[in-house]
A protein has these predicted regions:
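Acidic glycine-/aspartate-rich tracts in secreted/extracellular proteins
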Residues: 96-101, 197-200, 327-330, 367, ...
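Glycine-rich, flexible loop motifs
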Residues: 21-86
Length: 400
């Protein structure tokens, strides 16, 4: 049960003839996973038996192979420090320390501290955050502390949440989102979603400086403790779609959004326990569970939304800001088909039955919608050119 190193001109067989050769290989659909993902006792990972990966050291090709499942503690394998930081993405590397192969975990997405591109190879990653406890049968149904699906004994299912390495955030070279956007979870074999409502990584600007027109510049992210971008920054559905496409992402359809949000508790009128939904709220707040609304840091005492998480570990599906989807419909409340000048200056026109005849669905609810917020909540009364201060989004992409 160990990593082994093969090297051109050193071992009996050259890398070119080693059976596993070919960039990387593994047995099955993945090679990196969380240990006992439904027990929640340990934050350890397993590198599966049969994994192999190539590395070019600037002179010759080398290959690492794994014989036997290799269990490791990411915190003990950090390049810096010995504790995993909450709300962060980590990357797993195979690195060469002299002639000894080892596993190194880092916040760096390029290569770990103490190594470079010729002595390390990124093979996967994970996110540290909140985790909803779910059934052990592979169906990912929320459970109470006795293991009953949607149960109310002990710790009721809505409150049965913990923290650690999010099991369905673990990715590798075989099992990964098409775009390594960061802050993502796997929803099913075909779909990955951002954990958080998207926020600004780079400020968004528009054609002619006019909100809602074509995006000139900007970049979004999925990150803990940030304010989600909305119409406050000038964005409508078209803009979210443009920004997503530029970064290799896309908007969710309504049915996909429901899959992401499944297992999120319904919002409440009188509290922010299950989402930023209290009817006295007056504005959006920062992303994430147990978040300090002022600093964006995790606050286990006064942080809001401690249980605002879905079965697949997406946060804020109920409340905070409505989330644009790509699903549209037609509004036939009036049927005077004509060219409608609604798309913005220099954007063309829309031939519709009325000036609001192309609704785009938004989901989840907003910051003061209370019990109207939930994992199927949908609003079909808004159109994609609408710039609204309480409309944000969540991004997705297909599996590689």
């Amino acid at each position: 049960m160990a990593l082994k190193l093969w090297q051109d001109g050193v071992d009996i067989a050259s890398v070119a003839t080693i059976p596993e050769n070919g960039n990387f290989k593994c047995v099955g659909d993945y090679f990196l996973k969380k240990k006992d993902p439904f027990l929640y006792d340990e934050d350890k990972l397993i590198l599966k038996d049969g994994f192999a990966v190539d590395l070019y050291d600037s002179v010759a090709w080398k290959q690492f192979t794994n014989r036997g499942d290799l269990e490791f503690d990411p915190a003990a394998n950090l390049d810096t420090g010995d504790t995993l930081a909450f709300g962060k993405d980590y990357f797993v590397f195979i690195a060469l320390n002299g002639t000894t192969p080892e596993i190194v975990v880092s916040l760096n997405s390029t290569y770990p501290d103490g190594f470079d591109e010729y002595s390390s190879r990124k093979i996967g990653g994970f996110h540290v955050g909140h985790i909803r406890k779910v059934s052990t049968d592979g169906l990912w149904v929320p459970v109470d502390s006795t293991g009953a699906k949607f149960g109310t004994s002990g710790t009721k299912w809505q409150d049965n949440v913990t923290t650690g390495i999010i099991p369905n955030s673990v990715w590798d070279l075989k099992n990964r989102p098409r775009t390594l956007f960061g802050g993502m979870v796997k929803i099913n074999k075909n779909l990955w979603s951002t954990i958080y409502q998207v926020s600004a990584d780079e400020a968004v600007t528009f054609m002619n400086g006019t909100n809602g027109l074509s995006v000139a510049e900007g970049k979004l992210q999925s990150k803990y403790g940030e304010l989600p971008v909305t119409g406050t920054e000038g964005l409508n559905q078209y803009n979210f779609n443009e920004l997503a496409q530029r970064q290799g992402m896309r908007l969710l359809s309504y049915d996909e959004w429901c899959a992401v949000a499944f297992g999120s508790p319904q919002g409440e009128d009188g509290s922010n326990n299950y989402g930023w939904t209290k009817t006295t709220n007056t504005a959006r707040t920062r992303t994430g569970c147990q978040v300090n609304t002022s600093t964006g840091e995790r606050d286990t005492v006064g942080g809001v939304k401690p249980y605002a998480i879905s079965a697949k570990n997406a946060v804020d599906c109920a409340g905070n800001v409505w989330e644009w989807t790509k699903t549209m419909s037609l509004d036939f409340s009036s049927t005077n088909w004509a060219w409608q000048n609604v798309l913005g200056a220099n954007q063309g026109q829309a031939y519709l039955p009325n000036s609001a005849g192309l609704p785009a669905l938004v989901c989840g609810g907003s910051w003061s919608n209370g019990v109207d917020c939930g994992p199927r909540t949908v609003n079909g009364n808004d159109y994609p050119w609408n710039v609204s201060t309480n409309f944000g989004s969540r991004f997705a992409c297909d599996s590689l």
